[in-house]
C-alpha cells in the first residue's frame, strides 16, 4: 500500500496526461460530457486500481465515464466490476448536443438504456446498470475503491450519496472524484467536503470543475451528520464555501469560490443546480 506522500506525489505529476488516447480503445468512441483531460483521467484511474473494491459511477448518462473507467480497469490486471447508476433518460436537447450521430427521439425523457448497453458492450460482463433515482438507491456491495460522483445536482441528493456510499470507501486506498465540485451552481459540494476534511485529502483538480480526493479516515455517522448540507441556511452555506476556499488555497483559484458565493446571494434558498442555472439564464 502506498503511503499518503507517495500518493500525493503520484497525482501531482498528473500522469494521466501522458496516456495516449489510443490506449482507451473502444471507450474513446463513446459519447460523453467529459472534458478531454477527464477522459484520460478516468482511464488512468481505472488502470491504477489495487483490487481493494468496486468501482461506482454515479451519474452515467450515456456511459461515457463508465466506458473510460472500464477501459482502464481492463488493463489493470485485477478483477474488476463497475456499478453504474442513472435514470438513463435524456432530453432531446442533451441528446442532440452529445449524441448528434444518433437519431433524435421524438420526445423528451427518452430511454438511453439501449444506447448505453451498446456503448458498454465490450465490457458487458464487468458492468451492472442500476436504473432509477439515485436518491432511492442503497449501497450494499462492500468496499468501494473508486467512487465517481456526477449526480449530486442538489443538496439533498449530495447528503444521500454521502450517507450511502462514502462509508464504503477504504482509507489509504479509495479515490473519490467529485466531478462537479467547482461548479458555481453546486456550492453544496465543497460545503459538504470541507466538513469532511479530516476524512479526505484533496489530490488534484481535473479541469474543468472536477476534484479528486483520497479517503484517509473512516466515515462515521456523526461525521456525515455534521457535514450535511440539505438544511443549511444561506449564511451557513456561504460560511462553508469560504472555509473550502481556504482549504483548497493553492490548488483552486479563489475566484471559483467567489462565483459560488455570488450564486447563493442571487438565488436565496435554492438548493438545486438546474434551478440556479435556469434563474441565472
Predicted ranges, named:
Residues 1-52:
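Class I SAM-dependent methyltransferase Rossmann-like catalytic core
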Residues 8-11, 25-28, 47-281:
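S-adenosylmethionine/decaboxylated-SAM
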Amino acid at each position: 500500500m502506498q503511503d499518503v506522500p507517495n500518493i500525493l506525489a503520484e497525482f501531482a505529476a498528473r500522469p494521466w496526461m501522458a496516456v495516449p488516447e489510443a490506449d482507451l480503445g473502444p471507450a474513446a468512441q463513446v459519447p460523453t460530457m467529459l472534458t478531454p483531460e477527464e477522459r484520460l483521467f478516468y482511464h488512468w484511474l481505472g488502470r491504477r486500481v489495487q483490487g481493494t473494491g468496486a468501482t461506482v459511477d454515479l451519474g452515467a448518462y450515456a456511459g461515457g465515464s463508465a466506458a473510460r473507467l472500464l477501459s482502464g480497469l481492463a488493463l489493470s490486471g485485477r478483477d474488476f466490476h463497475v456499478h453504474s447508476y442513472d435514470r438513463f433518460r435524456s432530453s432531446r436537447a442533451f441528446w442532440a448536443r452529445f449524441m448528434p450521430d444518433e437519431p433524435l427521439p421524438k420526445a423528451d425523457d427518452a430511454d438511453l438504456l439501449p444506447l448505453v448497453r451498446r456503448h458498454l458492450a465490450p465490457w458487458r460482463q464487468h458492468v451492472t446498470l442500476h436504473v432509477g433515482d439515485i436518491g432511492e438507491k442503497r449501497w450494499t456491495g462492500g468496499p468501494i475503491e473508486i467512487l465517481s460522483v456526477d449526480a449530486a445536482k442538489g443538496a439533498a441528493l449530495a447528503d444521500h450519496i454521502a450517507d450511502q456510499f462514502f462509508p464504503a470507501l477504504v482509507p489509504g486506498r479509495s479515490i473519490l472524484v467529485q466531478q462537479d465540485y467547482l461548479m458555481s451552481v453546486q456550492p453544496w459540494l465543497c460545503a459538504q467536503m470541507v466538513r469532511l476534511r479530516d476524512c479526505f485529502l484533496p489530490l488534484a483538480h481535473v479541469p474543468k470543475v472536477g476534484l479528486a480526493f483520497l479517503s484517509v479516515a473512516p466515515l462515521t455517522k456523526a461525521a456525515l451528520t455534521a457535514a450535511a448540507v440539505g438544511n443549511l441556511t444561506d449564511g451557513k452555506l456561504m460560511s462553508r464555501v469560504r472555509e473550502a476556499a481556504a482549504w483548497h488555497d493553492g490548488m483552486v483559484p479563489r475566484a471559483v469560490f467567489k462565483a459560488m458565493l455570488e450564486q447563493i446571494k442571487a438565488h436565496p434558498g435554492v438548493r438545486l443546480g438546474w434551478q440556479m442555472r435556469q434563474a441565472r439564464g
